From Swiss-Prot:
It is an enzyme of class 2 (transferase). The keyword Acetylation does not apply. UDP-alpha-D-glucose binds at residues 277, 336-338, 353-361, 375-378. InterPro entries: UDP_glucos_trans (IPR002213). One of its GO terms (molecular function) is nicotinate-N-glucosyltransferase activity. GO terms for cellular component: cytosol. This is UDP-glycosyltransferase 76C5. Its EC number is 2.4.1.-. The gene is UGT76C5. It comes from Arabidopsis thaliana (Mouse-ear cress). Belongs to the UDP-glycosyltransferase family. Keywords: Glycosyltransferase, Transferase. PANTHER family: GLUCOSYL/GLUCURONOSYL TRANSFERASES, UDP-GLYCOSYLTRANSFERASE 76C3-RELATED. Pfam families: UDPGT (PF00201). The keyword Transferase applies.
Amino acid sequence: MEKSNGLRVILFPLPLQGCINPMIQLAKILHSRGFSITVIHTCFNAPKASSHPLFTFLEIPDGLSETEKRTNNTKLLLTLLNRNCESPFRECLSKLLQSADSETGEEKQRISCLIADSGWMFTQPIAQSLKLPILVLSVFTVSFFRCQFVLPKLRREVYLPLQDSEQEDLVQEFPPLRKKDIVRILDVETDILDPFLDKVLQMTKASSGLIFMSCEELDHDSVSQAREDFKIPIFGIGPSHSHFPATSSSLSTPDETCIPWLDKQEDKSVIYVSYGSIVTISESDLIEIAWGLRNSDQPFLLVVRVGSVRGREWIETIPEEIMEKLNEKGKIVKWAPQQDVLKHRAIGGFLTHNGWSSTVESVCEAVPMICLPFRWDQMLNARFVSDVWMVGINLEDRVERNEIEGAIRRLLVEPEGEAIRERIEHLKEKVGRSFQQNGSAYQSLQNLIDYISSF
């Protein structure tokens, strides 16, 4: 760590696994460059302060009932959090600024800025009223962050109703999306989404800058276009975990027995299956995935979160005839140490929902993907994997045993898989070069450090 520069940065993550991890990683990056770190967080899904003893953690009430905490409706959860947390956040931030102003002597630190997740709709006006610069962190790709603001309008005014003959056509405004992807991305009434997205857009444009955990090597055209769209400084500092070795900021406890089990498997023979920390699936989806794994006859590591199968506790509905075979070839756990799993020599492929963090973790470990996107940005991420980078196979919405079995065989057994592995090795090297001196992520991070220090 560099010597303290006398500056403090306040960070405010959304309390979702895919949002907390990047924010904590960013905190670690800034701390290594001499900044002191304060993390404001909700009671719900609070990050593990004990894992980061050099940071200051401040908890604010979120007003969620036990029933609301268990909801699988992310849009409802975001609405409740934004409604309930505005006043407690304002009070907490005001006290922090007052405390900093009253400090004297060597202990005095200047609060440089606030960095807030793009899903918080009230942070920009509060920061502005307190004369504190605010930067926005997006956990999406640059491409999706841009396109989410116009997709509702495109769906309503341009692409609906969609003819069967148009399903595979590219969305001209946002390739590589297909027209049929828009319907899956916007699977709720667009009138409900419009006010939320409009607030996010206006808050972002009024902020002092925008941070992405991506780099120009992965999304060059969109980075350039985003600078034109938002007219604010944009920093693509690269996949966050590439700056530091993994440390646990997971909200779930990983099953560490995965690693010794993987140690017993042959190189690049195991298919790793995980659909992230938010996605829920039906009982029939789980059974189709189980049959696909069984019929592929390849060793596998399957993650099934408790409560992730709608209406069920865990995997109790998988038929005994399948479980017997599954137990012979694979291992089923409730949560896995994903970064450690992906870098293991035994992993030959990743059947993933294509959340952005999972996607770039797979790229950075050169693990080819089988894409099974379910919602929101995952469809666009999967298109990048299969159609742009060509480092995976896209199942789209086909949760069918034959499709899953075939994709596993194509990836791990057939010649097609070897070509995909070569391409993802090249992509890994390309992304890796972005972190070297004068690389895009390296330079963007340095620009971010200088920018924050200038406030």
